[in-house]
C-alpha cells in the first residue's frame, strides 16, 4: 500500500512537471516568433532581449524534462497551445507580461502540488524557475509600460539597434541585469 501511495504521489508531481514543460515549450516558440518579427521591424535591441528570454525558457524546459526523467516519467514534447503570430510591437510586451504572470501563478500552484506530495526537489526547482519568470515579467511589464506611456518616442530610440546577443548564450535571467 505504501509503495502504491508513493507511486501515485510521484505521478502527480510528474504531471505538473510535464504541464510546466509544455508551457515552457509554448513560451519558447512564442518568444522566438516575436524575436524574428521584432528583428524584421528593426527593433533589434528588443528582439535580442526576447531571444535571450526564449533561451531561458529552453533551459527551463530542459530542467523540467530532466526532473521528469529522474522520477521515471516521460517528458512531453508538445507545447501547451499555439503561438500568437503577427503581433504589432505595441502588443508584444503586454501580451508577454500576461503570459509570464500566468506562468508565475500556475507554477506557484504546481509548487504546492510538489509540497503536498512530498517532493522537495521538484518544489525547489519550481522556486528557482519562478524567480527567473519574475525577472521576465518585470522586463516585459517595464518595456510594455514604456511603449504605452512614451509610444513612438520610445520606439524611435530603439529602432535600428542591433539584435546581436553577442557571445551570451546563457539567457536573460542568468546574466547581470539581463545584459
Question: Model regions: which residues?
Answer:
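Iron-associated oxidoreductase/ferritin-like identity signal
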Residues: 1-179
Amino acid at each position: 500500500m505504501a509503495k502504491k501511495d508513493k507511486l501515485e504521489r510521484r505521478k502527480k508531481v510528474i504531471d505538473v512537471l510535464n504541464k510546466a514543460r509544455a508551457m515552457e515549450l509554448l513560451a519558447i516558440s512564442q518568444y522566438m516568433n516575436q524575436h524574428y518579427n521584432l528583428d524584421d521591424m528593426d527593433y533589434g535591441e528588443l528582439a535580442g532581449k526576447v531571444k535571450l528570454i526564449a533561451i531561458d525558457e529552453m533551459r527551463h524546459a530542459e530542467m523540467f524534462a530532466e526532473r521528469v526523467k529522474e522520477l521515471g516519467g516521460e517528458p512531453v514534447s508538445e507545447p501547451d497551445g499555439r503561438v500568437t503570430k503577427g503581433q504589432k510591437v505595441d502588443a508584444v510586451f503586454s501580451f508577454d507580461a500576461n503570459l509570464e504572470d500566468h506562468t508565475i501563478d500556475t507554477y506557484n500552484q504546481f509548487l504546492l502540488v510538489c509540497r503536498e506530495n512530498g517532493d522537495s526537489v521538484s518544489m525547489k526547482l519550481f522556486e528557482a524557475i519562478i524567480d527567473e519568470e519574475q525577472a521576465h515579467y518585470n522586463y516585459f511589464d517595464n518595456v510594455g509600460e514604456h511603449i504605452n506611456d512614451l509610444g513612438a518616442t520610445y520606439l524611435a530610440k530603439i529602432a535600428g539597434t542591433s539584435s546581436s546577443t553577442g557571445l551570451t548564450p546563457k539567457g536573460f535571467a542568468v546574466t547581470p541585469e539581463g545584459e
